[in-house]
Amino acid sequence: RGLINSPFIVINGDDFYGLDTYQVIYDYYKNGGNDFSMVAFQLGKTLSEFGSVKRGLCTVKNKQLQTVVETGDLEKSLTGIKSDRDIQLNGSEPVSMNVWGFTPKIFTYLNSMFNDFLTSNVEEPTSEFLIPTVVNSLISSNEEKVRVLNTESSWFGVTYKKDKDYVRKRLKRL
């Protein structure tokens, strides 16, 4: 805080997002975008062949993020994609893989919300302060809008040990 005075990106350090992902978020801010942003991936391009995963399933309206709902036990099945929720999924649904674009204004929100989080969770040492929770709160209170940017890139990362060979092969092809 105090050192960043322009839009910036927040990502998971152990995931690969593809060049297009960075290009779309860069272009958004270069071309005058002012809202917070998130790059959405297609659910089907983020699943593991070796087990179920958890993803932030997004509701989007007019390119604006409405909600991000953590959805677990996602995996391919004969009838589509199953999950821990009673919903129909076909793989084209937008999901958050934690590629966020923020302006420095986020630091004010994070400071306040993190202090509240610590106070509320003092007895819960395993609780986590999650960016999607912050974003959902800002959207539901109408304090911020989050522009959803789409990418054709395939996400990949090592969720399971068996994913390691696949990721190695993909990285060698770059």
What are these regions, as identified by a protein language model?
Residues 61, 68, 75-174:
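Conserved alpha/beta core of the MobA/IspD/sugar-nucleotide pyrophosphorylase nucleotidyltransferase superfamily
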Residues 8-9:
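Short aromatic/hydrophobic "clamp" motif used to bind/position activated sugar donors
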